[in-house]
UniProtKB/Swiss-Prot annotation:
PANTHER family: TR-TYPE G DOMAIN-CONTAINING PROTEIN, TRANSLATION INITIATION FACTOR IF-2-RELATED. The gene is infB. This is Translation initiation factor IF-2. Keywords: Cytoplasm, GTP-binding, Initiation factor, Nucleotide-binding, Protein biosynthesis. Residues 76-121, 154-178, 294-305 have a biased composition (Pro residues). Residues 34-463 are annotated as: Disordered. One of its GO terms (molecular function) is GTPase activity.
């Protein structure tokens, strides 16, 4: 068989069933799933080589051959000519049977011929006859002959080849009494065995030694190649094909002389004989269908009392003849047989089908049984064919006729439970119900890992191990760290922490840490700096770090950051240094951007470059001041001489001290009235800045930015401080690295970033990545708008070519190629997105579901922020999120960006009911028309604190009004009047305030409120209706349906007034 072959095809070719092939493949180390699986050509060759080496393999469920006693008879051979009827035999004579001749091998006919039409079978009833003892061999077993069966269609005799004597072998092909052999009609191409003489018995025409044989001949094997087991051939059914018989078996009531035995070797062969092949072993033991006397083990005397019930000796046949239906097998109990206990079939081996069986085991015909079919002849639990007597209770046997090998149903028979055998095995059991799995099925299921799913997977517990997780990590990330199932962690979080989280959702840091404590792990959240460091290390990159010994360092200019309180003159001082007017270009006269400039100052006759960074002094620009302090070498702290130290002054000083940079104090506005520079020196002494004239090491310089006084002294102090305390050197021949100070979206140039190079040289054409933005440097501009080809350390330039606007404060570095820059930026975007989702979602817990439902009713103000530079947008967002007007109103910024207001922003605002805040930007294109059409409100601001003030007022206006109770007046009841169709009316005297109609009232009796939430429905002054009655006047007050009014009660009226929110 070339190429791949299926298991059932190999089983058919080898003449075994599929289970045997599967077992053999497993023994050879090859795992095959089922009978329809394919195997490779090398495995097929190895399998074929293994079968001849092992001999005839034994399939599960078949009976094995056993050695028989010596001196047994021979097996009769099958006939070679079909179509001739056998001669009638004598009537059954009970007696001690001798050894039975074993049937010989089948001789196939040269060509199949159709059988003659069947003749009506007439049942022959055998009369009981006194048994005559017959001397048997010492190894024979006592047994009684079976009752005669009805004669079947006669078949021609055929000479058979005698076989050598061998031990007895139980024949699984014994015919059933009372049923026709061969299924009532000879099958085409099936030879019919003759009724020749048997060894050890009388010749033709005389009585047989073991009693009469069965009524008809057994069909022989089909000529040609041997057929596969029925369980492996999907195109054959047991009821249509020939029975895989090893040869005809003489049975009781057989007409004609017994067949001639065939000599066989006495050595037993392991395994089950295949159909159509000679069977090893000696003669079959006597009993029903025996051709000779049954051997008696140990020379035991015959059983007294004549034949036992069920032995077949002289017993009438079963009712029903040959064609009657067989009743349910479950209604019969095991019948005792003529053999010793545990040996069904008389002298057969235990568990083998044959003549009489032991109690509780399938055995021979145990007396009259209704039904025209014999019982199943096989070991319990094994599919046997027709043949040997009644089957076990509850298991109907196969049809009448020659019995097949154990495990294969006979021709014309049926599988278990009376159902036709399937393509890959015998049919089901006789009784309904669920079948039990065999050991092999359980073993294969266990080996294949087909286990039932278990509820509640185990989670490995820790012993305090540290686990590093990034911000916004999911439970799947946690499971990867501890080698657990993410679904199990979801279950743990839900059952033990009460939070509903999926395996892939981003979790908050608190949730991850609490889960770690629950499972015995120490969860460490990786900081953004460490995350970025690990990301760059994955690309063999690094930011910052120490210089190597082989790196050549060059001197660089100092980076000076000007810091201080708002309106203390920082930008004006820079204008004086640069001889420019930056303040005039700032809205509101305050700095709202961080700017970087490089100027050349003459110090001691030398022109020294100095890089200045201007930071805003407004309180909302804390992040800008912090970034300025991080990238600077020297901080110039500007303090107004007339104003002194202010909150932002202290904050700027703290930033400088945290960065560990030296500070130079510039006392500005010394020319202004009321200026007191000494006071400033004294105040800063409290914060650790001691002037040199006071014995400290901090240089104080008195300057006037307006009059440009003592500017050279300030520059000299900066240079001296840099030379004295700083080593201003950096490498120039390495990849450029630095910090993005500011970013904006230019209408004609696209994203523009102001970067400060810290090391290396930045050139046009380099691939750079800054935060989540990446690109290639298309052009570089200086502070005056001139082109720059390359920028060295401490040089601020504007870089064009980014794909998006970098955030202020992002680190930038040059990478080898654009692909690496894009991958780094994408990973940073994913990391930030996960962190934002973890913070924004806020996992719902079982305890906070109702609270969140209530929060859904809370009023919320949605905003979209657009600004000119990223630093201003960041400062505005931080300032707005700090506004707190109460829990009833929330502020949510759904989008922010740099650049003009676009139509996309308008559509997003329309869908989310948001307000657009434009900071130093205007609408683009038709955004204004679209906003008017969609009803979207757009606010424009150029000063940041104006935007903050308006948003705060809007939030306060969205608050729900708060009401308080205001007392209007009280009236004392003097008399109670009964008015028809109205009720009781209180004649009262107004003691204080005013009593008005339709106001709320309460009734007080003896200082206790009797009724509350009443309404003054009627108010009269004498007979006239009145709207209000003032103090000192009498009136009649009706409280509607409330009539429990008594004299001396007090009626108090009040109203709810709205209280303005603070």
């Amino acid at each position: 068989m070339a190429g791949k072959a299926r298991v059932h095809e190999l089983a058919k070719e080898l003449g075994v069933d599929s289970k045997t092939v599967l077992a053999k493949l497993k023994d050879l180390g090859e795992f095959v799933k089922s009978a329809s699986s394919t195997v490779e050509a090398p495995v097929v060759r190895k399998l074929k080589e293994a079968f001849p080496a092992d001999g005839a393999p034994t399939s599960p469920g078949r009976a094995t051959s056993r050695p028989g006693p010596p001196g047994g008879g021979a097996r009769p051979t099958p006939p070679s000519r079909p179509g001739l009827a056998p001669r009638p035999g004598p009537r059954p004579v009970p007696g001690r049977p001798g050894p039975l001749g074993r049937p010989g091998p089948a001789t196939p006919a040269p060509s199949p011929s159709p059988a003659s039409p069947p003749l009506p079978a007439s049942p022959v009833q055998a009369s009981p006859v006194q048994a005559s003892p017959v001397q048997a061999s010492p190894t024979s077993a006592p047994a009684a002959p079976r009752p005669a069966a009805a004669s079947a269609v006669p078949a021609p005799p055929m000479p058979s080849v005698p076989s050598a004597p061998s031990g007895p072998r139980p024949g699984p092909n014994a015919p059933r009494p009372g049923a026709p052999q061969g299924g009532g009609r000879p099958r085409p191409g099936t030879p019919v065995p003759p009724s020749g003489p048997t060894a050890g018995g009388p010749t033709a025409g005389g009585p047989t030694a073991g009693g009469p044989t069965a009524g008809g001949p057994r069909p022989g094997p089909r000529p040609g190649p041997r057929s596969a087991a029925p369980g492996n051939n999907p195109y054959t059914t047991p009821s249509a094909g020939p029975r895989p018989s090893a040869g005809p078996r003489p049975s009781a009531g057989q007409s004609g002389p017994p067949s001639t035995p065939t000599p066989r070797p006495s050595a037993p062969r392991s395994g089950t004989p295949r159909p159509g092949t000679p069977r090893p072993g000696g003669p079959r033991p006597g009993g029903t269908g025996a051709g000779g006397p049954r051997p008696t083990p140990g020379g035991m005397p015959p059983r007294p009392g004549g034949p036992r019930s069920g032995a077949g000796g002289g017993m009438p046949p079963r009712p029903g003849g040959t064609g009657g239906p067989r009743p349910n097998a479950n209604m019969f109990q095991p019948r005792p047989a003529g053999g010793p206990p545990g040996r069904p079939g008389g002298g057969g081996a235990p568990g083998r089908p044959g003549g009489g069986g032991a109690p509780g085991r399938p055995g021979g015909g145990g007396g009259p049984r209704p039904g025209g079919f014999a019982g199943r002849g096989g070991a319990p639990g094994r599919p046997g064919g027709g043949g040997g007597g009644g089957g076990a209770p509850g298991r109907p046997g196969g049809g009448g006729g020659g019995g097949g090998a154990p495990g294969r149903p006979a021709a014309g028979g049926r599988g278990r439970g009376g159902t036709t055998a399937g393509a890959f095995g015998p049919g089901g059991r006789g009784r309904p119900g669920r079948q039990r799995k065999s050991k092999r099925a359980k073993r294969q299921e266990w080996e294949s890992g087909l286990e039932a799913p278990r509820m509640g997977a185990m989670v490995p517990r820790g012993n305090g191990q540290a686990i590093r997780l990034p911000r916004g990590a999911s439970l799947a990330d946690f499971a990867d760290k501890i080698d657990a199932n993410p679904g199990a962690l979801v279950q743990v979080v839900f059952t033990q922490l009460g939070e509903m989280v999926t395996a892939t959702q981003s979790c908050t840091d608190e949730t991850l840490q609490l889960l770690g404590v629950t499972l015995g792990y120490e969860v460490q959240i990786v900081s953004p700096e460490d995350e970025d460091k690990e990301l760059l290390e994955s690309f063999d990159l690094s930011f910052g770090g120490e210089y190597g010994d082989d790196v050549e360092l060059s001197s660089r200019p100092p980076v000076v950051t000007v810091m201080g309180h708002v309106d203390h003159g920082k930008t004006k001082l820079l204008d004086a240094i640069r001889s420019t007017d930056v303040v005039g270009g700032e809205a509101g006269g305050i700095t709202q951007h961080i700017g970087a400039y490089q100027v050349r100052a003459k110090v001691d006759g030398d022109e020294r470059p100095i890089t200045f960074i201007d930071t805003p002094g407004h309180e909302t620009f804390t992040a800008m001041r912090a970034r300025g302090a991080q990238v600077t070498d020297i901080v110039v702290l500007v303090v107004a001489a007339d104003d002194g130290v202010k909150p932002q002054t202290i904050e700027a000083l703290n930033h400088a001290q945290a960065a560990g940079v030296p500070v130079v104090v510039a006392v500005n506005k010394v020319d202004k009235e009321g200026a007191d520079p000494a006071k400033v020196r004294g105040q800063l002494t409290e914060y650790g800045l001691v002037a040199e004239e006071y014995g400290g090491d901090t240089m104080f310089v008195d300057v006037s930015a307006r009059n440009r006084t003592n500017i050279d002294g300030l520059l000299e102090a900066i240079v001296l401080t840099a030379d004295a305390s700083l080593d201003l050197r950096a490498p120039t021949e390495v990849e450029a690295q630095g910090v993005a100070i500011e970013g904006r979206l230019d209408r004609g140039r696209g994203p523009v970033a102001t970067v400060l190079v810290q090391r290396g040289t930045l050139r046009v054409g380099d691939s750079v990545v800054a935060g989540e933005a990446f690109g290639r440097v298309r052009a570089m501009l200086d502070e005056h708008g001139g082109q720059v080809v390359e920028a060295g350390p401490a040089r601020p330039v504007q870089v064009l070519g980014f794909t998006s606007v970098p955030d202020a404060g992002d680190n930038f570095l040059v990478v080898p190629e654009d692909r690496v820059a894009r991958q780094i930026a994408e990973r940073r975007q994913a990391r930030e997105r996960n962190a934002e989702l973890a913070l924004s979602r806020g996992r719902p817990t079982l305890e906070t579901i109702l609270e969140r439902m209530k929060e859904g009713e809370k009023t919320q103000l949605n905003l979209i922020l657009k600004g000119d530079v990223s630093g201003s947008v960041e400062a505005l967002e931080d300032a707005l999120l700090k506004i707190d007007v109460g829990d009833e109103v929330g502020l949510r910024i759904i989008d922010r960006g740099v650049g003009a207001i676009t139509e996309t922003n308008v559509m997003l605002a329309s869908a989310s009911d948001a307000i657009i805040i434009g900071f130093n930007v205007r609408p683009q294109g038709k955004a204004t028309e679209l906003a008017d059409r969609e009803g979207v409100e757009v606010r424009y601001y150029s000063v940041i604190y104006q935007a903050i003030e308006d948003i705060e007022n809007a939030l306060k206006g969205m608050l729900k009004p708060v009401y308080e109770e205001a007392q209007l007046g009280t009236a004392e009841v003097r008399e109670v009047f009964r008015v028809p169709r109205i009720g009781n009316v209180a004649g009262s005297l107004v003691r204080s305030g005013v009593i008005r109609r339709n106001t709320k009232a309460r009734l007080i009796r003896d200082g206790v409120v009797v009724a509350d939430n009443l309404t003054v429905e009627s108010l009269k002054r004498f007979k006239d209706d009145a709207t209000e009655v003032r103090e000192g006047y009498e009136c009649g007050i009706g409280l509607g349906s409330f009539n429990d009014i008594k004299i001396d009660d007090v009626i108090e009226t009040f109203e709810q007034r709205e209280v303005p929110r603070a």
